[in-house]
Amino acid sequence: MIKRLLSFLDASPVNFLAVKNISEELEKNGFRRMNPQEPLGKIEAGEKFFVTKNDSSIYAFQIGKKPLADAGFHMICAHCDSPTFRIKPNAEMLCEGGIVKLNTEVYGGPIMSTWFDRPLTLAGRVIVKGENAMSPQTLLLHVKRPLLQISNLAIHFNRQVNDGVKLSKQKDVLPILGIINDELEKGNLLMNVITDELNIQKEDVLDFDLYLADATPACTFGVHDEFISSGRLDDLSMCWAGVEAMIAADANDTTQVLAIFDNEETGSQTKQGAGSPFLSYMLQRIALAQSHTEEAYYQAVERAFMISADNAHAWHPNYSEKFDPTNHPKLGGGPVIKFNAAQKYASDAVSAAIFANICDAAGVPCQRFVNHSDVAGGSTLGNILASSIPLKGVDMGNAILAMHSCRETGSVIDHEYCVKAFTKFYQL
């Protein structure tokens, strides 16, 4: 099981590739790709299908034996984006000695220092000419070799570096791409990489969404190989747990939904984010296809339950003072239910009890997380989604260290626990 997760992480350096890989895995397991531009048609019990939005979010459905109005739906949601650096247009910056660095902007909230002095690569999508102006073609790019690096300033020029350094997002985190060898490469070094990798012509390239990614493969470590080290555990590990559970669960009375959104790290307010009405539209279309009445959708929502799956903070042995004294989850302790008095999480006593029951039925331990009262925490998908679909639900996630680092640390057994809990949820 863990090898499949590591392979998925390595093959999914950005949201677009994560959605591609999830799509292919679903298709291999009997799910049919549907075009949301076309009518759904008749919806049969047991039918399995998925749709995508913007090539960066994906929504999978296994239709229950009972109509949505009668049995509701069980939904797991997660997000496939992670903090990184986006390549700006006109990105090449020529420096002395022919060195070319790339102009970038920060995406989300990365721990920027963790991106220094490690091999990086490029991944994303490239838009090329299509049949007409309104239908350009999308090509996915993943340079599968070390290509760039952000280098630190030597300690000899900054003796206070170990006392803390304030980093400029515009100046200090620009990656080195290469050295120009001849005049023809001037201004074309990045474009040459793109066209060579995709075997296309420069004049066909219209635009791109490209991002930096860690070029080092995901791995396990520890005396017993009990830990996972990888970029993007937040939140691809939860995405993949949802995929594994959706594939493993057989059809039952309740419709099963897996929603993997984009842009959680920047607020979710996009057409492919949790703040979009797209998922609501899809559920309404399914309900209407089954019962031909709008009332069916509203009944389904009242019978539904959502698991919002986004990683939680594991207790850190070097920084124990940052954690709540009685609610600090450990690596290897099972899925974590997240609470917040300011309602940043969807969890309440009822939904938490339901999720704890699910874990118990799956033979899985679970933990609880509350922020230290003097330390502000983040928010996640649950309440954003609930603002458009008023679902009963719980915010949870597996505990990890170094959230938003270029490489995060998780637990092997926690991933196995999570897949078991998610599978049991879909089977109820």
Feature-to-residue mapping (PLM):
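N-terminal hydrophobic/helix-forming segments and targeting peptides
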Residues: 1-428
